[in-house]
Regions:
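N-terminal beta-alpha lobe that positions the nucleotide/phosphoryl donor
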Residues: 1-215
Length: 215
């Protein structure tokens, strides 16, 4: 739909290819092809939407190098918040509440088992660098923890080239509510309406509703 409705559409290559190292490579995070498109179109600004390339600090840096305005966070902000372990520690240092977690990566299966026992099942296994619901698995019991670790690590490596994971307590019955903040280069800041995104499949949002029912 977006390609059909666009004034111009640029082919970035095959949508998805398997690399020799087992990683999955997708065209929209190919910085070389994206640079070609930015140069060819003489783009003045780039807004890549949400998720994936929109959360790559390297793409924001590419835009800076080309003199293209990147509509999104700075590379420094992305690096501070793009790593889930680093962002949790940052939130804790500011006195903000976070979902109970192990406090450190799950470096081994034995370490993960110890952490999960302290947190209490069920737990979530999450890739520290994962986005878009990738690299996330549930572990209901100690018996399902090894497969959850293996699955989360494998998926995170395939998509992001990172296999570091950590454990977090699973909160059943919780709701997923987003609040986005929009700011400009002149100090203007706006908090956008909250959005309900609890309807998900495989940890990926299916429906977003605003305003949030019940709030």
């Amino acid at each position: 739909l977006f390609v059909r409705e666009a004034d111009e559409a640029w082919d970035l290559g095959p949508a998805m290819v398997e690399g020799g190292d087992g990683r999955r490579k997708v065209a929209y995070v190919d910085l070389g092809r994206l640079e070609e498109a930015l140069r060819a179109t003489r783009a003045e600004a780039a807004w890549p939407g949400w998720g994936f390339v929109a959360e790559l600090p390297e793409f924001a840096e590419l835009c800076e190098r080309l003199g293209v305005t990147f509509i999104g966070p700075s590379p420094a902000a992305m690096r501070a918040l793009g790593d889930k372990i680093a962002s949790k520690r940052l939130a804790e240092s500011l006195g903000l509440p976070v979902v109970p977690w192990a406090g450190a990566p799950a470096a081994s299966e034995a370490e993960a088992a110890r952490q999960a026992a302290e947190l209490g099942f069920p737990v979530m296994v999450k890739a520290t660098g994962g986005i878009g619901g990738r690299g996330v698995r549930d572990a209901e019991t100690a018996g399902t923890l090894p497969s959850a670790l293996k699955g989360a690590r494998a998926e995170a490596w395939k998509w992001f080239g990172l296999a570091t994971v950590f454990l977090e307590r699973r909160l059943d019955g919780a709701r997923h509510v987003d609040v986005q903040v929009l700011s400009d280069a002149w100090g203007g800041v706006w908090a956008l309406p909250a959005r309900e995104a609890s309807i998900q499949r495989r940890h990926q949002k299916l429906v977003e509703e605003s305003p949030v029912p019940g709030l």
